[in-house]
Amino acid sequence: MRSGKLINRKSYPLTRYGFICAVSRKESSSDLSLSLNEPLNINASKIKNSLGYIGLFQFGEAALIDLGYYKHWNANSDKTKANDWTGNWVGKNGINSLSDFLKSPSKQIQIIGQWIDFLCERLRNRNFNEYYGKIINGIEITESGAIAGAHLVGDGGLGSFLGVPGFKGNYKESDGNNVHISKYIDLFNYYDLESCCDRKIYILLRNQIGQIVKNKKLTIQSEYNGKFEQSKFTVDTESDDQGLLPVIIRACPHLKNWF
């Protein structure tokens, strides 16, 4: 099975859990291919950085508000957006405090799964999936890369980078450490997130006499007409060692917008 790009000298399979491991590796230097009881992972789950982001995946208050774990600032004693965590938690999934969150790496993994699904649906509802397959500044836009980028700077920053009308130039494309979203999109591309809808299908590549064609480089061209994006996309790709060629669907079947 193919792996993603190296992150702190480690790479992970291009699966949903591989994506979770890779994001955690980048955010907190953990290694979730090891037991959660490993000191490396225990320490990573308790991290709170200088900007107030917490845990294995460096969540901020806004993300945990979106997921229903931390009370919204409007209904909380914590009225700031500074990731100071001085307010009240909702109690969802047994997490009633910052301490509860930091001491439970297994629940943090559950939460990142919920976050992936949340962002997948949000990006679809905002038609950002129309940009999947497009090349921007030399980087192909994929679902996993886009979700990682939204985790870094929010969907506003992602929309700005993609050039979505109403977003372009109105949101920051870099985080508080000056990491640009393009780095995350490139680093976390091509993972199969296995959720939201079946984004990826596989085509078995055969030659004219029926032989399976393995590790064959080729170029795919497609046309798409959506709310924001009407264009032809060209992507260079390669069949794997079984002759399978991954094809990413830009939108869910029930939206009737196919690759």
Q: Across the structure, where does each feature detected by a protein language model lie?
A:
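Non-catalytic cell-wall polysaccharide-engagement segments
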Residues: 1-21, 25-35, 39-43, 48-50, ...
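Short glycine- and hydrophobic/aromatic-rich loop-to-beta-strand nucleating segment
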Residues: 57-58
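A short, amphipathic beta-strand motif
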Residues: 199-209
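Short, ordered, surface-exposed loop/turn motifs in non-cytosolic proteins
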Residues: 208-226
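Short, acidic Ser/Thr/Gly-rich low-complexity loop/linker segments typical of extracellular
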Residues: 226-245
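Short Pro-Gly-centered beta-turn/loop motif in secreted/extracellular proteins
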Residues: 240-258
